């Protein structure tokens, strides 16, 4: 969020946003949590569309913050009905990160090609077998995929602690009952530059899968 110090109106808005940020990230715990990961610095819990309304309400509050940080409209929730939500709860009783996974059937490989990059920037897709998905160029040849990562977010004060990687590991293990989603069965939706860096590092390739 951008504001101007010294501008009374901006400082008031910023103060309200900061208060909302702290309040929404606070998490005292639920009686019937579905814990899918436990660590020395916190735990990961899972929420689905079938979860209690108060649980889904908390997820939406977190997504408002995540959307702001990731550059999406704060009220944007383009999530399929079969979505799975994972929240990382730190030992200081705050939501430190979240990931949203959803079922997909196919995705496309990101293309790293100088000509493609120029073409995408000018929005003139002329290369054969190339599509544009969000901000990225990708192959028009779809490949099978199982799990789409709609959002992956970690609070700024908790970054560089492998929280995103642990969220992804848990998502892969618990997205489908009795099946661990493979790295090559994961796809990301229009990642930010930081998100692209993470996706490449986590999957071990710059040509990871994207979907829309």
Protein language model features and the residues they cover:
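Glycine-rich acyl-CoA binding loop
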Residues: 159-171
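Non-catalytic substrate-recognition and accessory regions of acyl/acetyltransferase enzymes
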Residues: 1-156, 173-196, 200-212
